A protein has these predicted regions:
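"Short basic amphipathic alpha-helical interaction patches in structured regions
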Residues: 30, 52-58, 94-98
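Short mixed-charge
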Residues: 1-12, 64-76
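Conserved TIR/SEFIR loop-to-helix hotspot centered on a Trp-containing motif
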Residues: 45-67
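An anion/phosphate-binding loop that grips the pyrophosphate of nucleotide cofactors and donors
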Residues: 36
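Conserved BB-loop
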Residues: 1-30, 46-52, 111-117
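Residue-level signal for short, function-critical loop segments
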Residues: 44-45, 84
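C-terminal interaction surface of TIR/SEFIR-family domains
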Residues: 1-2, 25, 32, 73-164
Length: 164
């Protein structure tokens, strides 16, 4: 939040672990996907095997495609984060299309991911990677004009990681 003028009254992000016990998690998740400005998938092998992760991707992609049909926005608002090194991942085609490497992140980030950097005690590299990713996320949020959508757009989501 230090990079933005966000007032801190509400959380600037959504992590599906914050859904309260007894809450309608699908509705809450769909609302978050219909209103967030940036989608930040955390790339792990397990991520690409989870049905709802593929459905979340589908929802956000639909939202971007829908807006492109009705009004322009300035670019893709999916910013992937490598949790492990790229050599440990088999990306489904939909994810392989999205650039996850950037020179400012460096080779160490690509080889180890955030988790690998942290576990190896490479705290300076870890912090610089997190800082660079935070700057990218804020920049994308500010530059893309992705508008909220109606959650009806998400009524028949499919796992876009499956069967590709």
């Amino acid at each position: 939040m230090q990079l933005t003028d966000h007032d801190g009254e509400e959380s600037p992000g959504f992590l599906d672990q914050s859904i309260d016990l007894g809450e309608d998690w699908q509705s809450r998740l769909k609302h978050a996907l219909a209103t967030c400005r940036v989608f930040v998938p955390i790339y792990t092998s397990r991520y690409f095997k989870r049905e709802w992760c593929g459905k979340e991707w589908d929802a956000f992609a639909r939202r971007q495609e829908e807006q492109l049909r009705t009004r322009p926005y300035t670019g893709n608002a999916i910013i992937p984060v490598l949790w492990v090194g790229q050599q440990h991942l088999t990306l489904p085609p939909v994810a392989a299309k999205v650039q996850y490497a950037h020179p400012v992140l460096g080779k160490d980030y690509l080889q180890s991911g955030l988790y690998g950097l942290k576990q190896a005690g490479r705290h300076a590299k870890y912090r610089s990677s997190v800082w660079a990713l935070a700057q990218m996320i804020v920049k994308v949020a500010q530059q893309t004009s992705l508008e909220p959508c109606d959650t009806e757009l998400f009524k028949d989501l499919r796992n876009v990681f499956e069967g590709e």
